[in-house]
């Protein structure tokens, strides 16, 4: 999901840069699809194509998930990945629109290959990111072999992750998007699944994890509660109404909510006559009461070393030497977390 325009309203006073080590001992509910798409977009070969095994199956998402999760665990973080389930009915039209955009980009890739334009191939390949059911199941298998818990959400993954954070079972949601705040997560941690260095145009910039707290956002924007933040997001555009209200930018959206108090009042006044492809009040109700499950286990399990090697090296042609070294790192990180948990138990920390 993605409420990109909302991020423009969230200033530095509501953000706090941190180091991975600052999250040691914390359980972070990571938006699995968001992370996998990040890996698919960033882990590419020079020609723009993703990493693949000998059978032509994409492995960029597995490489990113494997090595980045180990980095998080070495920092003492307890990750749990939450996978999307069935999307709400009113999101299906947007999903179809995205599919058409990707198909158009693929046509441009084929054209660029035919014309020998390598730069164009790389450019358009980054727009052709498909996450298939097989790729998702492989990601779950990888996490299981690593002993890392994952949760299957009944609907939106960020809604489930936010629910777990609200209940205090996880400290925060990890995602690049801000939707978890709309779903009620007390905290959002961004930049966990991305490389510490990211290319911005021609420059390589340092990227640090940052914490965004819901209460700090509401205070900074002078909003009375999460419902008003949802109202602002709907005016700007969400995954369910990506175009938002024509002519309404971040500052105007905030001004309207502060002036009228609620989306309901605006629909009867200033927004009367505005056409919405999806009932905005239905979107609001979904953010406030999304489908979630209480059936999840967040405990880290033992590493299945043989399963990992067979899966990554045997099935997907990863380097045996690199995987062996990474598995040792994973086992050491897991052992340190167990020791830390025992120390906390016996010393009441």
UniProtKB/Swiss-Prot annotation:
Claim: GTP-binding is one of the keywords in the record: no
EC code: 3.1.-.-
Entries under NCBIfam families matching the protein: fen_arch (TIGR03674)
Entry keywords, A to Z: DNA damage, DNA repair, DNA replication, Endonuclease, Exonuclease, Hydrolase, Magnesium, Metal-binding, Nuclease
Annotated stretches, region: N-domain: 1-102
Assembly with partners or alone: Interacts with PCNA. PCNA stimulates the nuclease activity without altering cleavage specificity.
Cofactor: Mg(2+)
Binding residues for Mg(2+) 1: 31, 84, 156, 158
Protein name: Flap endonuclease 1
Coiled-coil parts of chain: none
Region (I-domain), start-end ranges: 120-261
Residues where Mg(2+) 2 binds: 177, 179, 239
């Amino acid at each position: 999901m993605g409420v990109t325009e909302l991020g423009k309203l969230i200033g530095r006073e509501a953000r706090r840069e941190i180091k991975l080590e600052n999250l040691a001992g914390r359980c972070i509910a990571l938006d699995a699809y968001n992370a996998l798409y990040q890996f698919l977009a960033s882990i590419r070969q020079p020609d723009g194509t993703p990493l693949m095994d000998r059978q032509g199956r994409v492995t960029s998402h597995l490489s990113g998930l494997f090595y980045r999760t180990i980095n998080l665990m070495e920092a003492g973080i307890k990750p749990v990945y939450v996978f999307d389930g069935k999307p709400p009915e009113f999101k299906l039209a947007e999903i179809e629109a995205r599919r058409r955009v990707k198909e158009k980009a693929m046509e441009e890739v084929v054209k660029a290959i035919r014309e020998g334009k390598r730069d164009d191939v790389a450019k358009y390949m980054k727009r052709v990111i498909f996450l298939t059911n097989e790729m998702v199941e492989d990601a779950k298998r990888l996490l299981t072999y690593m002993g890392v818990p994952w949760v299957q959400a009944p609907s939106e993954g960020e809604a489930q992750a936010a629910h777990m954070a609200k209940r205090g079972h996880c400290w925060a949601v990890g995602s690049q998007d801000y939707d978890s705040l709309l779903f009620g997560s007390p905290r959002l941690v961004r930049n966990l699944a991305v490389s510490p260095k990211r290319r911005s145009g021609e420059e390589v910039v340092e990227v640090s994890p940052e914490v965004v707290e819901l209460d700090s956002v509401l205070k900074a924007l002078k909003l009375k509660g999460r419902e008003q933040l949802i109202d602002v997001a709907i005016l700007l555009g969400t995954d369910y109404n990506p175009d938002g209200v024509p002519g309404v930018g971040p500052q105007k959206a905030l001004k309207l909510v502060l002036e009228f108090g609620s989306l309901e009042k605006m629909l009867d006044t200033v927004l009367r006559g505005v056409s919405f492809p999806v009932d905005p009040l239905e979107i609001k109700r979904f953010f406030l009461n999304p489908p979630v499950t209480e059936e999840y286990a967040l405990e880290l399990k033992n590493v299945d070393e043989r399963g990992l090697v067979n899966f990554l090296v045997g099935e997907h042609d990863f380097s045996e030497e690199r995987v062996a070294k990474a598995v040792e790192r994973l086992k050491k990180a897991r052992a340190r977390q167990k020791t830390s948990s025992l120390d906390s138990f016996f010393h009441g920390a």
